[in-house]
Swiss-Prot record:
Part of the 50S ribosomal subunit. Forms a bridge to the 30S subunit in the 70S ribosome. It comes from the Bacteria. PANTHER family: LARGE RIBOSOMAL SUBUNIT PROTEIN UL2M, RIBOSOMAL PROTEIN L2. GO terms for biological process: cytoplasmic translation. It comes from Clostridium botulinum (strain Eklund 17B / Type B). Belongs to the universal ribosomal protein uL2 family. This is Large ribosomal subunit protein uL2.
Amino acid sequence: MAVKKFNPITPSRRQMTMPTFEEITSQQPEKSLLVSLKSKAGRNAQGKITVRHRGGGVKRKYRIIDFKRNKDSIPAKVATIEYDPNRSAYIALVVYTDGEKRYIIAPAGLKVGDVIVSGPDSDIKPGNALPLKNIPVGTVIHNIELQKGKGGQLVRSAGNSAQLMAKEGNYATLRLPSGEMRYVRIECRATIGTVSNPTNDIVNIGKAGRKRHMGWRPTVRGSVMNPNDHPHGGGEGKSPVGRPSPVTPWGKPALGYKTRKNKKYSDRFIIKGRNAK
């Protein structure tokens, strides 16, 4: 998929780029797979801000995605490739031979008219989903389960893929996009191929207004706040931080500070961390 540039008729247009959406085949989503999505604006159930800089944005509906891919041995034909405002990857509407319709994460190269299928006896081709024990070593995969039957949780964003490196006993070794090597149970499912929209990471937003349409609000630097609002605030003019290192609004180190729990249950499954040399 290509990226479109614009003539520099305004300062923001000079830098802006946008996907060409040449893979998209339908503008109208399947109504039976839509649900209302209330804007949370970064608030939790108590109304407190848990994610800063969120709010506003264009109204959107949530598309119900089939991450489990548990409709085995029934072929499904790809009806449309669609844009999903809730994720970076494109989605595909598939129609099973029994008439049921579902959305799936569209892998790269999937086209309208292609036939996909789930189950342990499926062929190794993009879009098919099967347990890791039935996938050959070296295969590129995405939408990977961490628990059998729970649905894919890993490698779902645009252009990403993991690789099946080895299988031993009850576990398969995967290399994730971050560089992390980890064990996953071999009965967990994954989908063959790479996630669609690989050029998503080189798109330049170009202007603040386009970011506001996505539901992001401005970020204010701590150094221009008052001292009661941020540890970096206060002072006359441009003042230094006044601490050994920059900190968050709540006083914790902001750069290079490890926030992962050091006794997390999944540590036993991680062979090599994403930051390991």
